[in-house]
A protein has these predicted regions:
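Sec-dependent bacterial lipoprotein signal peptides
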Residues: 1-19
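Amphipathic beta-strand/beta-sheet edge segments enriched in Tyr/Trp
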Residues: 20-23, 143-190, 194
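N-terminal leader/capping segments at the start of a protein or of a new domain
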Residues: 25-60
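A short, hydrophobic beta-strand-centered structural micro-motif
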Residues: 49-54, 70-75, 126-155
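N-terminal segment of the mature soluble domain
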Residues: 49-127, 177-181
């Protein structure tokens, strides 16, 4: 009995080790089509097209006449049916726009941390006054970039169709006017295969 149990456990261990997962690196720019859900290819495509649209816009030429305008990027609202990390989309767009050399940015997501550090420098008595950052010297944003990511999903059991739409806006903070807006769209489809004998 013990011998049979040991033999069964040995066979089970051998089978379990044969089902191990292989991990490998892939090209981050390669098209990813594992599912119709939002993925890395969608992030790269939407952000790349949107950034190029803003860079090529006559509005960008107009607001850049007196130098690189200062922007802050508000969070992109996820209005899709999926849990999507819109912060990754926001970060990617901000990075690409900054690399373009056409814009400067302030990071509103870190205001509380910056304020805490400045207060520490001013009030703690621990910071050398010669190296202390003075209050009231930060650059203010002139424009706000913000948007929404929405989706429409249709599924009839055989075909699943997913449509994504990213809408972005650039607002002049002085006047409240929209100086630029664009939409980029992606449609993905999956079909269930039927067995053919």
């Amino acid at each position: 009995m013990k011998r049979e149990l040991c033999l069964c456990l040995g066979v089970a261990a051998l089978l379990a080790s044969g089902c191990s997962t292989e991990v490998s690196y892939g090209d981050a720019k390669e098209t990813e089509t594992v599912t119709v859900d939002y993925g890395s290819t969608d992030l790269q495509s939407l952000s790349g097209k949107m950034v190029q649209s803003l860079i090529d816009s006559p509005a960008t030429t107009e607001i850049s006449v007196n130098g690189r305008p200062v922007l802050f990027v508000d969070s992109i609202r996820n209005k899709s049916s999926e849990h999507i990390d819109t912060e990754a989309l926001t970060d990617t767009m901000r990075t690409q726009l900054l690399r373009s050399g056409k814009f400067r940015f302030v990071d509103m997501s870190k205001v509380a941390a910056v304020k805490e550090q400045l207060e520490y420098q001013q009030t703690s008595g621990q910071v050398d006054p010669a190296s202390m950052v003075r209050l009231g010297k930060q650059t203010g944003a002139q424009y706000m970039l913000y948007g929404n990511l929405a989706s429409i999903v249709k599924d009839n059991g055989k075909v699943k169709d997913v449509f994504y739409q990213l809408t972005m806006n650039l607002m002049d903070l002085r006047s409240g006017e929209l100086v630029w807006a664009d939409q980029q769209e992606i449609r993905k489809q999956s079909k269930k295969k039927t067995l053919g004998w």
